């Protein structure tokens, strides 16, 4: 029997048992080793703010439809997209994957999972990389996608608003792309880690700094060439708009919830011809769509880790036993100043 995390109601975490069915000939069974919790998307389901819980998403017309029907209802099972596991069983015709291979991917906070051989083959983790870092494959792909949307040029100043897990990764990638990165957050610990891990050249605490004015003073009153917003806060988006140069770009990567209060679109946005670009992993920059699919994004990020070009060890703040998943979600929800990447540990389950 396997076990999976379930949200039975907002802020209520439980578990369900499920059967481990026999394998088909080209399938592989994985035992989960670690699973990372997303502080953005997953917390929207945990808190009950996710729009799928309140409206119906029409995938054909790509519209959220108000009404009595919703796309999700509690209990919500199987959430989680930052997993890494070990191969423990092979189908009779599997040739390209071996027992004990480590596979990264997305299968939710569950103890076991079955994948096709091709899925596992495409996501074999380098032996040189500690297994726990496999949890970053998907969020790393999201970060690369956002940096691609930004179209950073060497020598540009990039302001990253929100130095949580995703912001830390975006900052490292932006610096690798030749940018000077200004990291912005309201939690001092995150700013310290951003400097330590190489995610920022300069940091600003938004709780005690007039960010837009400070960034302009750093750039001969020009403003940042690009701002990347990864908080999901409209207040941060407003500051990002205020911080960029005339005719510049803001990449909005955060998952905003509810109505957008705190935006003053008649001010800098209008007068400075600011372009806001939504960045989401379901699609890529149109110019790159032919060459960059999600698998390439994932594999590229894992290669950066294996080659030592990205340092994610400092951003793992908590490793918590899988059976204590409820406490892990509580920490992310109630103590964000203490938490970056929270990881569920299945190795003793």
At which residue positions do the language-model features occur?
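C-terminal substrate-binding/catalytic core of Rossmann-like NAD(P)-dependent dehydrogenases/reductases
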Residues: 212-217, 263-316, 327
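Mid-domain Rossmann-like dinucleotide-binding core that forms the NAD(H)/NADP(H) cofactor-binding site
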Residues: 127-208, 213
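A generic structural signal for residues embedded in beta-strands
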Residues: 30, 105-106, 160
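A glycine-/small-residue-rich N-terminal strand-loop-strand element
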Residues: 68, 72-107
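Glycine-rich cofactor phosphate-binding loops and adjacent beta1-alpha1 units
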Residues: 201-277
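C-terminal capping/lid region of NAD(P)-dependent oxidoreductase domains
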Residues: 221, 251-252, 262, 274, ...
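Short N-terminal strand-loop motif that marks the start
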Residues: 1-76, 345-349
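Short, well-ordered loop/turn sites that connect or cap secondary structure elements
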Residues: 96-98, 152, 244
């Amino acid at each position: 029997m396997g076990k999976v995390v379930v949200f039975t109601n907002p802020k209520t975490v439980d578990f369900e048992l499920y059967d481990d069915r026999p394998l088909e000939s080209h399938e592989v069974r994985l035992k989960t080793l670690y699973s990372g919790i997303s502080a953005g998307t997953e917390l929207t389901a945990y808190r009950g703010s996710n729009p799928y819980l309140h409206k119906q998403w029409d995938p054909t017309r790509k519209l959220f439809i108000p009404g009595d029907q919703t796309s999700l209802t509690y209990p919500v099972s199987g959430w989680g997209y930052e997993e890494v596991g070990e191969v423990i069983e092979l189908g009779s015709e599997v040739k390209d994957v071996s027992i004990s291979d480590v596979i990264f991917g997305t299968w939710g906070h569950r103890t076991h999972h079955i994948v096709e051989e091709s899925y596992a083959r495409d996501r074999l983790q380098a032996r040189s990389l500690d297994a726990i870092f496999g949890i970053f494959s998907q969020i790393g792909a999201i970060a690369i996608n956002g940096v691609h949307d930004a179209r950073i040029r060497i020598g540009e100043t990039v302001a990253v608003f929100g130095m949580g897990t995703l912001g830390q990764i975006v900052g490292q990638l932006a610096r690798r792309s030749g940018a000077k990165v200004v990291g912005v957050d309201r939690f001092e610990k995150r700013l310290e880690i951003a400097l330590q891990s190489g995610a920022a050249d300069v940091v600003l605490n938004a709780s005690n700094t007039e960010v837009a004015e400070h960034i302009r003073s750093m750039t001969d009153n020009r403003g940042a060439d690009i701002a990347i917003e990864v908080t999901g806060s409209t207040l941060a988006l407003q500051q990002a708009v205020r911080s960029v140069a005339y005719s510049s770009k803001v990449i909005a990567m955060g998952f905003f919830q509810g109505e957008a209060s705190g935006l003053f679109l008649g001010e800098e946005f209008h007068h400075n011809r600011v372009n806001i670009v939504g960045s989401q992993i379901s699609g890529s920059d149109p110019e790159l769509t032919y060459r960059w699919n999600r698998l390439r994004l994932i594999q590229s990020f894992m290669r950066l880790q294996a080659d030592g070009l990205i340092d994610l060890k400092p951003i793992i703040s908590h490793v918590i036993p899988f059976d204590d998943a409820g406490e892990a979600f509580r920490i992310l929800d109630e103590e964000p100043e203490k938490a970056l990447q929270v990881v569920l540990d299945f190795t003793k389950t």
